[in-house]
Amino acid sequence: MLLGKDKNTNYRIGETTFVFWNTLQDDELLKNYQEATFTGLPFDGDFDEEEEATSTSKKEPAEKRDPEKETKVVIQALRSALGSKNAYIDREHSDRFYILALAPNAKRVSVKLWMEGTVSEIVGNTLAHLDDMNIVSFKGLLDEEIPPLRPIYRIMKAIYTATDSTKWPRQVVQELLESIIKGLPYPPALQMACLERIHHDHTSKYPVTELRAALLKAYLNRKHRKNPQIKQLTMALDKSNSNPAYLAGRLFALLERIQEKAIPGVKANITDRYFRTASATPGIIFGRLLQLSAFHLSKIKKEHGGLGFYFDRQIQEVLELLPGGQATFDKFFSPDQQSIFAVGYYHQKAYRDQKAEAEANEEEQETEN
């Protein structure tokens, strides 16, 4: 029974039930597909990055699990079904994979979505989705071979404030699934919802979480993949990227870090006050932010010496990539530019070179001694 409870052949998001099966009748393949596409791993499906970053809970899981190891098992199993990591996606094979979306309509159940393809095609496109969504972790870790699982449930939970999945837009869920299955660009509504959530959370400690940054990066790369004139966003910090929006995001992250060092424990930092303005109307605010940062740098140089000059060099590295070496940005950023800003901001924060900061401090201490 495909709709049976706890079956690997269905998953419900809101009022929509997704049903999937294949001619191979391979339960293990269906389980791995369900976890990679819809649910995530059993122990992390209800816990996303922004919750992890801001949670104060000390509660440990009842059973010790290894998410990296179990993710690797899922990825390798799907690659085995495909043949290998870079195997040719066979769209003519007789082994078929089917996906159906059902939702209530008055007193009836209606078909909202129907898609089919070869097992190779469906599985291959899910793996492509995971590769596109791969990004450096907030702690600066990156595994290019085994990307994290980015299931639909966690994506939707990361970009909508509603915790009840029945309040998520059904059409967006279906369009996201269709884009994954067919290997198409993600729906624009996904980008807009993600940007709105980031702006909504600008006063939180982590407005741009790993998953949100991964989504915006993947959205833009898929959208522009066939345009060789547009540079693809990388998984980690790209110091050669001269896109003004990317540089604005990097610069904002640096200014935030400088303030953290100058005024530890500040109640309302520049992210709380200016993130939304800086990402949407950078031309209005960056001059003021740099003036503010000059005071912070002066304080750091007096108290920590070498660390202040280290931050100076970091800022100059970014400014040198801008026209005229000046932080002169457009008055307004488009949604795509705001997305690039968010990715640049996240990349810079994830890159934070704590070792270099520590060495800058040590150099100053040695000079004093």
Locate predicted features.
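Extended alpha-helical scaffolding segments
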Residues: M1-N369
